[in-house]
């Protein structure tokens, strides 16, 4: 089996899988707590680590159910901002063209891209609706940053073509919003290195104290040239080494339908 390392660093749970690993989206399509879906998926696919997936909204009936009840919402009431591509070829979710995805081909090659995850790119599995942290070695963050002063440089939006060689950080509005939240906010994400090692990092909501920039930079510190954040706050959960390191909030467990599983291969 590919070597797996776990450590706790500055309130961050860090799992690194060296060597081959398989991306397995976790999808709930019934009416049960998502933690039950995760545990069943983990047992069936022998997943090494599991975290939550993309941002999502709820239908009006889903909001009412979540507000007044303590039972799981029907999966149809959850409106995921992004797609999950299963190994069967099934595609679940909704369009989120401004978000990013992480995907994998059958030969274990990893990819990250912007836009909707689709079936026609040759991907075997994937998960969309994610926030970019670093893409092809370029940091994403709150505002465009450049290596030197440039006249008329754009601080947000698409940099001028002549300025792109000097770009050291690319603005992303979702990232900017997340970076302005309290440092105790839950955070989770997945990244990969040029040699296809996988890094999963998570901070429990209300417990940690790590800024969003530090969270991003920890992926880079561990060699990732591509990494994305999942839905944060009390949506974040982490399953590893036989159980949950921490769980999402009760109302999120009742409404979540997408997660990410990674299996270290033999």
Residue ranges of predicted features:
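Gly/Ser/Thr/Pro-rich low-complexity, intrinsically disordered segments
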Residues: 1-266
């Amino acid at each position: 089996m590919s070597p797996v390392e776990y450590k706790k660093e500055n309130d961050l749970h860090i799992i690194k899988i060296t060597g081959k690993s398989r991306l397995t989206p976790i999808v709930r399509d019934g009416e049960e707590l998502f933690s039950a879906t995760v545990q069943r998926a983990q047992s069936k696919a022998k997943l090494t680590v599991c975290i939550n997936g993309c941002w999502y909204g709820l239908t009006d009936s889903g909001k009412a159910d979540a507000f007044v009840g303590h039972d799981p919402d029907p999966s149809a009431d959850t409106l995921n901002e992004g797609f999950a591509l299963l190994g069967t070829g099934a595609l679940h979710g909704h369009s989120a063209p401004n978000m990013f995805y992480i995907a994998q081909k059958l030969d274990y090659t990893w990819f990250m891209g912007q836009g909707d995850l689709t079936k026609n790119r040759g991907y075997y599995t994937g998960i969309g609706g994610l926030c970019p942290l670093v893409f092809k070695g370029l940091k994403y963050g709150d505002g465009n940053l450049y290596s030197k002063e440039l006249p008329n440089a754009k601080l947000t939006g698409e940099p001028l073509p002549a300025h792109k060689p000097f770009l050291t950080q690319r603005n992303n509005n979702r990232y900017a919003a997340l970076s302005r939240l309290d440092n105790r906010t839950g955070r989770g994400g997945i990244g990969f290195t040029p040699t296809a090692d996988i890094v999963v990092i998570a901070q429990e909501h209300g417990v940690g104290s790590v800024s969003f920039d530090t969270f991003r930079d920890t992926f880079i510190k561990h060699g990732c040239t591509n990494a994305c954040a999942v839905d944060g706050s009390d949506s974040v959960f982490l399953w590893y080494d036989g159980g949950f390191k921490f769980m999402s909030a009760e109302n999120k467990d009742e409404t979540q339908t997408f997660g990410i599983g990674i299996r270290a291969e033999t």
